[in-house]
Regions:
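Short, solvent-exposed turn/loop segments enriched in Gly/Ser/Thr/Pro and often Arg
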Residues: 81, 205, 257-260
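GST-like domain detector, emphasizing the conserved glutathione-binding G-site
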Residues: 1-182, 279-290
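Short capping/connector residues at structural and topological boundaries
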Residues: 118, 135, 202-203, 255
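Active-site-flanking alpha-helical
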Residues: 61, 124, 213-214, 254
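GST-like fold's C-terminal all-alpha helical module
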Residues: 2-3, 136, 143-248, 288-290
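Long hydrophobic alpha-helical segments typical of transmembrane helices together
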Residues: 236-290
Length: 290
């Protein structure tokens, strides 16, 4: 346990320096910090995002739609560098007053869509894809979509932050959130013991929402906590994770707006399908180039 106990003051005050590596992206007020318009590309859908799990949900969905023949899902994906404060620019805040990624603008209907789950639902309804029309099956899909939206903050903002990113390690929050994440993995594992996909026998937006968080966790793609959490115990989650990881749209979706890892896996901005072949970082910045 910690050597000292924190006693909260009567009135909380913001100490920016205590934010660790995320000090520049978090603040206790909303609104823009500077004037900056967003770029607009040639495609119907404009996505402003970063290749975190919440961003990956949307790029996977867009790539799945394109692979299924929905040409209206063509999109420009613009990189939002949250470490540099891009999300606090006036143009971004106009689209997403919450200043989080991702946000999408549908130029065909002049519709802004923020929150990753809302974007998935918007696209599913717009294109009539990856969301069952049967009322019961649709409801089951939304059950799991909303489960993910409510549960993932315990994984990312809770466990991931205190285990991997916090400037100091504290036993209590790590234990508290590790317990909750293992409970969530057990929920998923029991569900997937009885069905192929999250909502049944159909691949849906529920799978696209959950995979970038929990699939990435059991594959060791986030937090490097596989041994700590003993993720090998969740065999049904691993089966489902591997099955989805083999899908080309998921492989492509994971590359978009990615700024870390293997340069060949980083497509920092996507404006055309050919970008996957010619504009990854290994092509733009070959090893050894000045």
């Amino acid at each position: 346990m910690a050597d000292k106990t924190y006693t909260p003051p009567k009135v909380w005050t913001w100490d920016k320096a205590s934010g660790g590596r995320f000090a520049n992206i978090n603040r206790p007020i909303a609104g823009p910090t500077h004037d900056k318009e967003l770029p607009v590309g040639k495609h119907p859908l404009q996505l402003y995002s970063l290749g975190t799990p919440n961003g990956v949900k949307v790029t996977v969905m867009l790539e799945e739609l394109l692979a299924a023949g929905h040409s209206g899902a063509e999109y420009d994906a613009w990189l939002i560098n949250i470490g540099e404060g891009d999300q606090f620019g006036s143009g971004y805040v106009d689209l997403n007053p919450n200043s989080k990624i991702p946000v999408m603008f549908d130029t065909t209907t002049k519709t802004r869509v923020f929150e990753s789950g809302s974007i998935l639902l918007y696209l599913a309804e717009k294109f009539g894809a990856f969301l069952p029309t049967d009322h019961n099956k649709r409801t089951e899909t939304l059950n799991w979509l909303f489960w993910q939206m409510g549960s993932a903050p315990y994984l990312g903002g809770g466990f991931g932050h205190f285990y991997a990113y916090a400037p100091e390690k504290f036993e209590y929050p790590i234990n508290r959130f590790a317990m909750e994440v293992k409970r969530q993995l057990d929920v998923l594992d029991r569900n997937l013991a009885e069905r192929e996909f999250m909502a049944g026998d159909e691949y849906t937006i529920a799978d696209m929402a959950i995979w970038p968080w929990y699939g990435a966790l059991v594959k060791g793609l986030v937090y490097e906590a596989g041994e700590f959490l003993q993720v090998h115990e969740y065999t049904n989650v691993i089966r489902w994770t591997d099955q989805l990881a083999a899908r080309t749209p998921i492989q492509r979706g994971r590359m978009v707006n990615r700024t870390f890892g293997d340069p060949a896996s980083q497509l920092r901005e996507r404006h055309d399908a050919s970008d996957f072949e010619i504009r990854t970082q290994d092509k733009l910045e070959p090893e050894g180039s000045s």
